[in-house]
Amino acid sequence: MDTPLLSDRERLIQALEASDQRRREHRADRIEWLALYEVTPPVVIGRPETMHMLREAREVFVDGHFVAALMMAMSFIEHTVVEELQLLGHVSGSPTFAQAIERAKEKKTFPPDWLLRAKTLSLRRNPFAHLKQGDHPHTLGARVRHEKKHPRVIVETDAKDAIELMYNFFVATLREDA
């Protein structure tokens, strides 16, 4: 019996269905993990860029794109820290993230342990955003050698820490409309 030839589109759909099936359990695990930290008020109004980063950090994390989740979560945190400092009159303009962290520490804008975690995660994010020498201590290769863990485990752990911290900053800066 002759099997009908499938179009490229039909083969693509079949491949996507198989991929979805293989990844479904892991995505469900990540959604359940996110539920421990995620806060979703009925209405949130904020800067469109910042709100998109919050949503995209969640989405790429669920899909297992851990470097992207780290990048998005840290971008959200940077926006949030700087915006809070601006709203409180502690800075004007757009300071660097390192400057914003230091200013937030001075002004006690956020808990010091959050700011320390944000600084650490920023250093871990930087080799993905800015090319570093191969032996730089924050590169993934150097961390794999030092921590003796698989790269995927390292970036997943970083992503989880960044996502959790992102939701901490999100909740801390929620305001009721007056």
Regions flagged by a language model, labelled:
Residues 57-58, 62-86:
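Short, hydrophobic, well-ordered secondary-structure elements
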Residues 18-22, 107, 172, 176:
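Surface-exposed polar/charged interaction patches
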Residues 85-123, 142:
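Short, charged amphipathic alpha-helical segments flanked by flexible coils
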Residues 112-178:
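Charge-enriched, short contiguous segments at helix-coil
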Residues 13-17, 51-54, 74, 118, ...:
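Generic structural concept
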Residues 64, 80-92, 128, 132-135:
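Amphipathic alpha-helical interaction segments
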Residues 38-40, 107, 148:
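A short, mixed-charge helix-start or loop-turn motif at secondary-structure junctions
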Residues 1-65:
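Charged alpha-helical initiation segments
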